[in-house]
A protein has these predicted regions:
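General structural concept
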Residues: 13-20, 31-40
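Alpha-helical solenoid scaffolds that mediate protein-protein interactions
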Residues: 19, 54, 61, 68, ...
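Aromatic-lined, polymer-binding surfaces characteristic
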Residues: 125-129, 133-143, 151-198, 213-232
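Aromatic (Trp/Tyr) and acidic
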Residues: 1-10, 19, 44, 79-131, ...
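Alpha-solenoid repeat scaffolds
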Residues: 26, 68, 146, 172, ...
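Acidic, glycine-anchored loop motifs typical of Ca2+
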Residues: 38-53
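Sec/Tat-exported extracytoplasmic proteins
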Residues: 16-24, 58, 62-65, 136, ...
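Long, compositionally biased, intrinsically disordered segments
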Residues: 25, 29-36, 57-60, 67, ...
Length: 392
């Protein structure tokens, strides 16, 4: 789909920022020229592609704060015929600004009377705001030296939004997966990234106060809290180590449920995203507590993506592996084709226990839709695995 969902955008920016920060990825195979509005693949321009991608996503996030002073749920076409459009996304609109004074077929080259412009949904959401500023704070660190002006704007925006949200009651409007996660989870993300970016003890204090959130959703937050250990006191570190010991017993339960040793989701959307996040968490835990969390708990996540899973042995990363996903729901879905490097949701467990991933029908979104946030987290995971293999 071509909806621009803010939650997706800030996940991508965060994952890519962490990947650049932790692995110093310097690949350059893309030319990006903002002035000319031109992108050319396989044409190096002397700039790391990942920084250009982070910059692009960050500009989308910061534009919301510049315009409205907050994050917004997202942008999407207004008409169902556009939503089900199967061709090039460029042709979903006439790319002209709508003018209600014009007839539907009238245009002056800049505006038209065709009511096809995308809509921005602007509901207030404190959790969404926190998720957005977490990404902006992370981006500010890696954009220093690359786009200093944007980096400075990002961290200042993040600090100011944090202050504003803590000066009032939270806006808790919630709709689907467009308004952020829970208030506590998103606030914790923001606190962690702001602590890493500013070193301000205020955020460390708030993180300590939020221990119940860390404890309750350890599978969600384990990786990020490992990054801030140097800023935390001994009491926090000890509580964290004790929680890792409990977590070690929890992940052993996965081996009882399935032979792959990973958490296979049973909801209406297949669980590759959850499995990748699980493996990334285990990477950070292994780096901090190698005596408690074995590196195999990281490898299992990538092994699952590459074919060690129910239903088949196909790789869920298109173009990677001897047999990979070749029919997927992406920009070229009408052609029953694929995009190399795209990651699909994977095996869906049909109730009660039937694993399914159709290899010949791209339109089952929950099995075969590429989503960019999983692509970004995959980039992190594959580099994490390479790091472990190179340092055995």
């Amino acid at each position: 789909d071509y909806d621009i969902r803010t939650q997706t955008q800030y996940y991508v920016v965060s994952h890519l920022a962490h990947a650049y920060e932790d692995f110093n990825l310097q690949r350059d195979q893309t030319l990006v020229d903002y002035d000319a509005k031109y992108v050319d693949l396989h044409n190096p321009d002397g700039k790391p592609d990942i920084l250009q991608q982070i910059e692009h996503g960050t500009l989308g996030l910061i534009a919301q704060h510049r315009t409205l002073g907050r994050a917004i749920p997202g942008i999407i076409v207004p008409d169902i015929s556009q939503y089900t459009h199967l061709g090039d996304g460029l042709t979903m609109t006439d790319n002209l600004i709508y003018d209600k004074e014009m007839d539907p077929l009238e245009t002056d080259g800049y505006k038209s009377g065709k009511f096809d412009d995308r809509w921005a949904f602007t509901s207030k959401s404190t959790p969404l705001n926190y998720g957005s500023i977490a990404a902006l704070a992370a981006a500010s660190r890696v954009l220093k030296g690359y786009n200093d002006e944007l980096a400075e704007e990002c961290i200042n925006t993040a600090i100011n939004v944090w202050k504003e949200e803590h000066s009032k009651e939270p806006d808790l409007f919630h709709h689907g997966n467009t308004t952020g996660g829970t208030l506590e989870d998103e606030e914790l993300k923001a606190a962690v990234e702001l602590l890493l970016s500013t070193k301000d003890e205020m955020y460390a204090t708030r993180i300590k106060e939020m221990w119940p959130t860390i404890d309750k959703n350890f599978n969600l937050h384990a990786g990020r809290v490992m990054k801030i250990l140097t800023y935390m006191d001994e009491d926090f570190k000890q509580k964290l180590k004790n929680r890792v010991k409990d977590y070690k017993n929890e992940i052993a339960e996965h081996r009882k449920e399935n032979p792959y040793g990973v958490p296979i989701g049973r909801r209406g959307w297949a669980g590759n995203s959850q499995i990748v996040s699980y493996a990334i968490n285990n990477y950070h835990l292994h780096k901090a507590f190698p005596d408690l969390i074995d590196k195999e708990e990281v490898f299992k996540g990538l092994n699952y993506l590459y074919g060690t899973h129910p239903d088949s042995d196909i790789s869920f990363v298109s173009g990677v592996g001897t047999k990979s996903k070749k029919v997927a729901y992406g920009m070229n879905r009408a052609d029953f084709s694929f995009i190399a490097g795209g990651v699909v949701p994977g095996v869906l467990i049909l109730k009660p226990d039937f694993p399914e991933n159709k290899e010949d029908w791209p339109f089952l979104w929950g099995e075969n839709e590429y989503v960019v946030n999983v692509g970004a987290s995959y980039i992190y995971l594959v580099n994490a695995v390479r790091d472990l293999l190179n340092n055995q």
